[in-house]
Amino acid sequence: VTAVHNIKSNKGSRTAGVDKIKMDKYLQMPKDELILLIQSSFRNYRPKPARREYIEKSNGKKRPLGIPTVLDRIIQECVRIIIEPICEARFYPQSYGFRPYRAQKHAIRGIINVINAGCKSPDQPVWAIEGDIKGCFDNINHRLLLQKLWRIGIHDKRVLKIISQMLKAGYMENDLFHATELGTPQGGILSPLLSNVYLNDFDWYVGRMYMEPHRQCKHKGNDTRRLKWAGVTPKYNYRYADDW
């Protein structure tokens, strides 16, 4: 029931998938009947292909969007509710995209704080390396993703099977079916969480390259000042979605 209400509150909740069934149908169903339908779908999950649409980006290019059926969105939201707390407990602290109670402003504030703590004077330059993972959602390896889910703590094979089937559901474009061997559909409920799972090892690897071997103080600001006066330049990793 929570999953249904979460989907209902989403901006695109009234958009139908390839089956052309809208959210209103499920909202009009008796509660017990809807719960039985969701339970049955869990036991015999066969996701339908996503409906491919394109939305314009600010640079004039178009970004592909995969719109699952409403029932598939409800199933994905159920899975998200189950696995998100497990994943959150293992995520890198300075990862800010697609996470509860985190936003761009928190990433910006963290970056400003380490800059202010690390500068001897207002005129001291601070270097930043910006990276953008090209085609991040479209190039996620399904096998590696499932392995990372297992390592992060998702050990229920039924849940892993549902995620695997969702990844391989494909999409429909101009009445033609296209298989998906790589990537997670942009527009899928689970895709943002799965992208964070996939990039979590990267976050920890880069973050530990500098801070972990030098960590002595409880507070990061104190470590920054100590290393600064020792002549060691502090380095930090901040990521928001596919930008770091």
Locations of regions flagged by a protein language model:
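Extended, charge-enriched "interface" segments that sit outside catalytic cores
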Residues: M23, L27, S41, R46-K48, ...
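Non-catalytic, polymerase-adjacent accessory regions of viral genome-replication enzymes
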Residues: V1-D32
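Residues immediately flanking
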Residues: V18, I81, G131-I133
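Short alpha-helical scaffolding segments that buttress acidic/His motifs in well-ordered protein cores
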Residues: A3-I7, C78, I162-L167
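Charged boundary/loop elements
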Residues: V1-G12, I81, P85-Q94
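Duplex nucleic acid-engaging cores and interfaces of nucleic-acid transaction enzymes
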Residues: G66, V70-R80, E84, F91, ...
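Conserved polymerase palm-domain catalytic core
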Residues: F42, P49, P93-Q94, H106-W244
